[in-house]
Swiss-Prot record:
Molecular function GO terms recorded: electron transfer activity; FMN binding; iron ion binding; nitric oxide reductase activity
Binding site for Fe cation 2: 83, 166, 227
Lineage: Bacteria, Pseudomonadati, Pseudomonadota, Gammaproteobacteria, Enterobacterales
Complex and partners: Homotetramer.
Gene name of the encoded protein: norV
Pathway: Nitrogen metabolism; nitric oxide reduction
Domain Flavodoxin-like, residue spans: 254-393
Name of the protein this chain belongs to: Anaerobic nitric oxide reductase flavorubredoxin
Superkingdom as given in the UniProt entry: Bacteria
Similarity comment: In the N-terminal section; belongs to the zinc metallo-hydrolase group 3 family.
Region described as Zinc metallo-hydrolase: 30-210
Organism: Salmonella paratyphi B (strain ATCC BAA-1250 / SPB7)
Cited SMART domains: Lactamase_B (SM00849)
Length: 479
């Protein structure tokens, strides 16, 4: 199957609706992906890239239905990774003498994967051209570390199509090929997710490389990526987004993520978020439990944020393993222009929060004070968490904050009456977790100030996941 891209250019790639893991299990491809290969038929026939190795046989069979393989004059490999050049061994078994145009670094990568040094490699550099007839040329532009040392782009004159490799792509599978045909919200979510999780470490290279390409003063009518859609409607919009994302990008957003053993650190996270919102109701605050959340969504939110609060319980005097792993990933992604603070609960000995603070600083974050709580935070400790959130909101504000009206403390009789109206605290008879009506349970959409009688029947204990029927009135409040 092929799809007409423009004039004598056809898409001959492979859709992968089922793929959910990429780069091992490091990247969750929740909307599948595609491996884009392009066949150009001018006076010379050119194949740009292949597909993932698991589709090698299918790819060659489909390609044979489009063209006699012996009629392919040139193969262009923009990138040697297996999702781009994976079908080379299957293809070259049929046409072993066909020249392969790629960078010098790509030869090393291709031989490292396919082990065929005898293939007919042709090394190209930035500015080199290849005449393909009918007055058209291919112009090559090296793009090292976007995102491998071997990467390059290929520009086709006449049709003004930039074959951009991984840049401007997204792991997004759709039967429709072009950017103006697909759901725009989904598309741009996946574009940002792709940039945040794959290209962020190389942001310092993005702007000068785009500037270099624009310096050729070549028109760009289409951008044909290696994954996802082909940009035919206003293709420069994605280029402009890349320039924006590469420039120490941040939004007025704070990301909080944590891991917890006994729910204590989660309670801290909720209270910190409440404090932030009290002082700055306009800032977007997102909370994630790393054990239950999509890691790449967390990292995308960190990319978007001006700051991040990371929480961990102490286990064996160190931070929780999932937190340690995610902080290591953030170190590799080399986020810039971001602030951070560590927090967490511990028992008889701490250690995790201090260790976490050091690791966040090593990862390049500008650090704010950390916060610790011993055992399960009581009302006083939770108020300290809220105050920490208030302080963070003020310290990390991007613009003057709205003035808050000082609340007058109610008389004691009113406070007692209000507290009584909420009813008693409830304790899980299995794990001893306590439901406090004053705090509610935000992760289950139970707002602070919700009496137990108004808690939905489908409520589950956050600790042991059992229902309301296992709860009793807290013994100290029973009459």
């Amino acid at each position: 199957m092929s799809i007409l891209v423009k004039n004598n250019i056809h898409w001959v790639g492979q859709r992968d609706w089922e793929v959910r893991d990429f780069h091992g299990t490091e990247y969750k491809t929740l909307r599948g992906s595609s491996y884009n290969s392009y066949l150009i038929r001018e006076e010379k026939n050119v194949l740009i890239d292949t597909v993932d190795h698991k589709f090698s046989r299918e790819f060659v069979q489909n390609l044979r239905s489009e063209i006699d393989l012996a009629d392919i004059d040139y193969i262009i490999i923009n990138h040697a990774e297996e999702d781009h050049a994976g079908a080379l061994t299957e293809l070259m078994a049929q046409i072993p003498d066909t020249p392969i145009y790629c960078t010098a670094n790509a030869i090393d990568s291709i031989n490292g994967h396919h082990h065929h040094p005898e293939w007919n490699f042709k090394v190209v550099k930035t500015g080199d051209t290849l005449d393909i007839g009918n007055g058209k040329q291919l112009i090559f532009v090296e793009t090292p570390m976007l995102h491998w040392p071997d990467s390059m782009m290929t520009y086709m004159t006449g049709d003004a199509v930039l074959f951009s490799n991984d840049a401007f792509g997204q792991h997004y599978c759709d039967e429709r090929l072009f950017n103006d045909e697909v759901d725009q919200t989904e598309l741009f979510e996946q574009c940002q997710r792709y940039y945040a999780n794959i290209l962020t470490p190389f942001s310092r290279l993005v702007t000068p490389k785009i500037t270099e390409i624009l310096g050729f003063n070549l028109p760009v009518d289409m951008i044909a990526t290696s994954h996802g859609v082909v940009w035919r409607d206003n293709p420069t919009q994605i280029v402009e987004l890349y320039l924006k994302w590469a420039a120490d990008y941040q939004e007025d957003r704070i990301t909080i993520f944590y891991d917890t053993m006994s729910n204590n650190t989660r309670m801290m996270a909720d209270a910190i978020a409440q404090g932030i919102n009290e002082v700055d109701p306009n800032v977007a605050v997102k909370i994630f439990n790393v054990a239950r959340s999509d890691k790449n969504e967390i990292l995308t939110n960190v990319f978007r944020s001006k700051g991040v609060l990371v929480g961990t319980s102490t286990m064996n005097n160190v931070m929780m393993p999932k937190i340690a792993g995610l902080v290591e990933e953030m170190t590799g992604l080399r986020f810039r222009n971001k602030r951070a603070s560590a927090f967490g609960s511990h028992g008889w000995s701490g250690g995790a929060v201090d260790r976490l603070s050091t690791r966040l600083q090593d990862a390049g974050f500008e650090m704010s004070l950390s916060l610790k709580a011993k055992w399960r935070p009581d009302l006083d400790a939770l108020e300290l968490c809220r105050q920490h959130g208030r302080d963070i909101a003020r310290q990390w504000a991007l613009a003057p904050l709205p003035e808050t009206t000082q609340k007058t403390a109610p008389v004691e009789e009113t406070t007692t009456c209000a507290a009584a109206d909420l009813g008693p605290k409830m304790q899980c008879s299995v794990c001893q977790w306590i439901y406090d009506p004053a705090l509610g349970e935000p992760l289950q959409d139970v707002a602070p100030g919700t009496p137990w009688s108004d808690v939905p029947d489908n409520f589950l204990c956050p600790e042991c996941s059992l229902g309301k029927d296992v709860f009793d009135v807290l013994a100290t409040e029973a009459k």
